[in-house]
Amino acid sequence: MSTKQVTCRYFLHGVCREGSRCLFSHDLTTSKPSTICKYYQRGACAYGDRCRYDHIKPPGRGSGAPADHSNRSSSSAGASAPGPGPPANTSKHLKKPLVLRDKALCSDSRPRVFSAESSELNECWEQRDDGAQKPHSYLEAIRSGLDASAAAAATAGTFPELQQTSPQICPFLAAGQCQYGESCPYLHGEMCEICRQHVLHPHDPEQRAAHEKKCMVAFEMDMERAFAVQQSQDKVCKICLDVVYEKSSPSERRFGILSSCAHTYCLNCIRQWRCVEQLHNQIRKSCPECRVVSEFVIPSIYWVEDQEQKNLLIEEFKSGVSKKACKYFDQGRGTCPFGGKCFYMHAYADGRRAEPDKPRKQLSAEGNVRFQNSVRLWDFIEEREHRSVPQLEDEVNDLGELFMQLSGASDAPH
């Protein structure tokens, strides 16, 4: 059957947003509206007589032809049992309902009736004070059942397995407040003097000792962090003369700690100093103030002055950068100029670690040190051919001028 022969259900309610592009029919005169309740055919329509769709039995189920919409109310009223409750199924073979009389499984004191076919239907109905039937959601039924069962378990002791093991600390009171009070099935812990939370077990000394130890370690770390911040807040960079913690950008509020020096520098300034190519290599690696050579700079958000703390910071720095790939080695495609002194990881593309070779150095005539990745004879020949000799030409010109002056002075008359 074409979809154009089926009436659009959204058009019936006046909320079809597709309009003329809708695949279903918007003509009530020529279309075949489907008004049969599919939930009634499954045996679980929660609306009963108030349902807007036709309650017609599917072919092959039940006895007789499908019931008409006009006699739907009379047949359902005659088949339903007296008293309040959800509409029952109009089948010939009615199964005996199951009555649960455990008060701990219900939100009130009344027993709940469940049928094998219509358990989902009966769970969606409850009794009101005026005798009418009111459907509610599954979430409310589950929540009310859990609250009632938890309260009954705490008062009557219906869960003996909880008494055999150590009771759990109440997570609600540990988070701040427990709304169940004395009816809470969990154990309310005592307050910890360090973290100020109700998480201490009143009868388990091992749990108390473990939690207090954990809190003490966290408290000591917080105190060390507070002391480090207090020690670092007034440090001034020796290059830009600005307080490091008062810089405008948060990324600039970091210290560049030299490995062999105790002078204060911000990370950006000391890195710019060590990247100046016009200076000698020994001068670039030295401190701008005391000229002590430091092999590397350690970035840190706190200022560290004690030597033991600096050594610990150096080890953490080396351990951190050793997990990063070296950009000069480039997974075996390049050569690292630092060789075995490189702090970064030298590994190939397949994950194998490489043993870096010792770098070869070359000292030029000007005193500059250059790293040689590969030494070839053609490199020396090419360098000699393109080498300029400005000093030799200047010396020849000076000697020529001096010879001309001497020859002119000797030819002059006395």
UniProtKB/Swiss-Prot annotation:
<feature type="zinc finger region" description="C3H1-type 4">
    <location>
        <begin position="320"/>
        <end position="349"/>
    </location>
</feature>
<dbReference type="GO" id="GO:0008270">
    <property type="term" value="F:zinc ion binding"/>
</dbReference>
<dbReference type="GO" id="GO:0007399">
    <property type="term" value="P:nervous system development"/>
</dbReference>
<protein>
    <recommendedName>
        <fullName>E3 ubiquitin-protein ligase makorin-2</fullName>
        <ecNumber>2.3.2.27</ecNumber>
    </recommendedName>
</protein>
<dbReference type="GO" id="GO:0006511">
    <property type="term" value="P:ubiquitin-dependent protein catabolic process"/>
</dbReference>
<dbReference type="InterPro" id="IPR017907">
    <property type="entry name" value="Znf_RING_CS"/>
</dbReference>
<feature type="zinc finger region" description="C3H1-type 1">
    <location>
        <begin position="2"/>
        <end position="29"/>
    </location>
</feature>
<keyword id="KW-0804">Transcription</keyword>
<keyword id="KW-0479">Metal-binding</keyword>
<keyword id="KW-0539">Nucleus</keyword>
<dbReference type="InterPro" id="IPR001841">
    <property type="entry name" value="Znf_RING"/>
</dbReference>
<keyword id="KW-0524">Neurogenesis</keyword>
<dbReference type="GO" id="GO:0045944">
    <property type="term" value="P:positive regulation of transcription by RNA polymerase II"/>
</dbReference>
<dbReference type="GO" id="GO:1901223">
    <property type="term" value="P:negative regulation of non-canonical NF-kappaB signal transduction"/>
</dbReference>
<dbReference type="InterPro" id="IPR041367">
    <property type="entry name" value="Znf-CCCH_4"/>
</dbReference>
<dbReference type="InterPro" id="IPR013083">
    <property type="entry name" value="Znf_RING/FYVE/PHD"/>
</dbReference>
<feature type="region of interest" description="Makorin-type Cys-His">
    <location>
        <begin position="192"/>
        <end position="221"/>
    </location>
</feature>
<dbReference type="GO" id="GO:0016567">
    <property type="term" value="P:protein ubiquitination"/>
</dbReference>
<keyword id="KW-0963">Cytoplasm</keyword>
<keyword id="KW-0833">Ubl conjugation pathway</keyword>
<keyword id="KW-0808">Transferase</keyword>
<dbReference type="GO" id="GO:0005737">
    <property type="term" value="C:cytoplasm"/>
</dbReference>
<feature type="zinc finger region" description="RING-type">
    <location>
        <begin position="237"/>
        <end position="291"/>
    </location>
</feature>
<dbReference type="GO" id="GO:0043491">
    <property type="term" value="P:phosphatidylinositol 3-kinase/protein kinase B signal transduction"/>
</dbReference>
<comment type="pathway">
    <text>Protein modification; protein ubiquitination.</text>
</comment>
<dbReference type="Pfam" id="PF00097">
    <property type="entry name" value="zf-C3HC4"/>
</dbReference>
<feature type="zinc finger region" description="C3H1-type 3">
    <location>
        <begin position="164"/>
        <end position="191"/>
    </location>
</feature>
<comment type="function">
    <text>E3 ubiquitin ligase catalyzing the covalent attachment of ubiquitin moieties onto substrate proteins. Inhibits neurogenesis and axis formation during embryonic development by modulating the phosphatidylinositol 3-kinase (PI3K) pathway. Acts downstream of PI3K and akt1 to up-regulate gsk3b mRNA expression.</text>
</comment>
<feature type="region of interest" description="Disordered">
    <location>
        <begin position="57"/>
        <end position="94"/>
    </location>
</feature>
<dbReference type="GO" id="GO:0002862">
    <property type="term" value="P:negative regulation of inflammatory response to antigenic stimulus"/>
</dbReference>
<keyword id="KW-0677">Repeat</keyword>
<keyword id="KW-0221">Differentiation</keyword>
<keyword id="KW-0862">Zinc</keyword>
<dbReference type="InterPro" id="IPR045072">
    <property type="entry name" value="MKRN-like"/>
</dbReference>
<dbReference type="Pfam" id="PF00642">
    <property type="entry name" value="zf-CCCH"/>
</dbReference>
<dbReference type="Pfam" id="PF14608">
    <property type="entry name" value="zf-CCCH_2"/>
</dbReference>
<dbReference type="InterPro" id="IPR036855">
    <property type="entry name" value="Znf_CCCH_sf"/>
</dbReference>
<dbReference type="Pfam" id="PF18044">
    <property type="entry name" value="zf-CCCH_4"/>
</dbReference>
<dbReference type="GO" id="GO:0061630">
    <property type="term" value="F:ubiquitin protein ligase activity"/>
</dbReference>
<keyword id="KW-0217">Developmental protein</keyword>
<dbReference type="GO" id="GO:0030154">
    <property type="term" value="P:cell differentiation"/>
</dbReference>
<dbReference type="GO" id="GO:0005634">
    <property type="term" value="C:nucleus"/>
</dbReference>
